[in-house]
């Protein structure tokens, strides 16, 4: 009878100690799952933020490209290139240049050229 009690007590103590170990293991597993879930949610939040920033950047680049496309200078004649004082037929001089008659006489006296102002 004593051996039965001792055996029962031994089995009871082992069951309680192993049960607590499993409970501690479950707690650790839960902590790991929570940390993993938090890491995943922060990863998804970062991806969402990245997508929003990329969309915003794309919109900004579109606006700047439209502005530069509309404001760019059309074809023009560079310095020292023959031009027409009334730029209907020929290209106008580029910005910062004026279509002037050369000061020296020579074979080109009938033409105007683009010079700096």
UniProtKB/Swiss-Prot annotation:
Quote a single Gene Ontology cellular component term: extracellular region
Q: Does the keyword rRNA processing apply?
A: no
Write out the GO MF terms.
sodium channel inhibitor activity; toxin activity
What pairs make up the disulfide bonds?
A: 76-94, 83-99, 93-114
Where does the signal sequence lie?
1-21
| The organism's place on the tree of life at top rank | Eukaryota
Primary subcellular site in the record, as a coarse category: secreted
What are the UniProt keywords, alphabetically? Disulfide bond, Ion channel impairing toxin, Knottin, Secreted, Signal, Toxin
Xref: InterPro entries = Toxin_22
Name the propeptide positions: 22-75
Expression by tissue: Expressed by the venom gland.
Q: Where in the cell is it found?
A: Secreted
Please give the function described in this protein's UniProt entry.
Probable ion channel inhibitor.
Which family does the similarity line name?
Belongs to the neurotoxin 14 (magi-1) family. 01 (HNTX-16) subfamily.
Comment, domains: The presence of a 'disulfide through disulfide knot' structurally defines this protein as a knottin.
Q: What is this protein called?
A: U9-theraphotoxin-Hhn1a
């Amino acid at each position: 009878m004593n051996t039965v009690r001792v055996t029962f007590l031994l089995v009871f103590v082992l069951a309680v100690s192993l049960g607590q170990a499993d409970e501690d293991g479950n707690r650790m597993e839960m902590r790991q799952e929570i940390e993993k879930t938090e890491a995943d949610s922060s990863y998804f939040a970062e991806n969402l933020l990245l997508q929003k920033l990329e969309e915003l950047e794309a919109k900004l680049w579109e606006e700047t490209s439209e502005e530069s496309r509309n404001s760019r200078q059309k074809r023009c004649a560079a310095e020292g290139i023959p031009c027409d004082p009334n730029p209907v037929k020929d290209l106008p001089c580029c910005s910062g240049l004026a279509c002037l008659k050369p000061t020296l006489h020579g074979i080109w006296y009938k033409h105007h050229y683009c010079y700096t102002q």
